[in-house]
Amino acid sequence: MTRFILQRSDRQQGWWVCTDLEHNIVCRFQEHNYNDTQQFTLLDGDKFDSEHEALRYATYLREMADWLRDNHYDKVF
């Protein structure tokens, strides 16, 4: 199964939406401006149950950023 999906935003022109299907995380960012515009949300109203879980999610966010850099550099930077 594919973990990440990248799609153009249907709400904002020039923005992209990256979804982590394994961990229910969505990142929205403006094309060529990832570092300054990234916005993360959890799907389905998910919330962190503990500080430990929040720290795990930091790893998932880094993995998403690495995937974007490695596979879609032209859209991110």
Annotate each predicted stretch with a short phrase.
Residues 17-45:
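A short, structured beta-strand/loop element
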Residues 5-10, 38-41, 70:
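Short helix-onset patch at the extreme N-terminus, typifying the N->h transition
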Residues 8, 27, 32-33, 70-77:
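Unusually extended, aromatic-enriched hydrophobic runs near protein termini
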Residues 40-77:
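Mixed-charge, Lys/Arg-enriched low-complexity segments
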Residues 1-24:
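Short, charged/polar N-terminal "headpieces" of proteins
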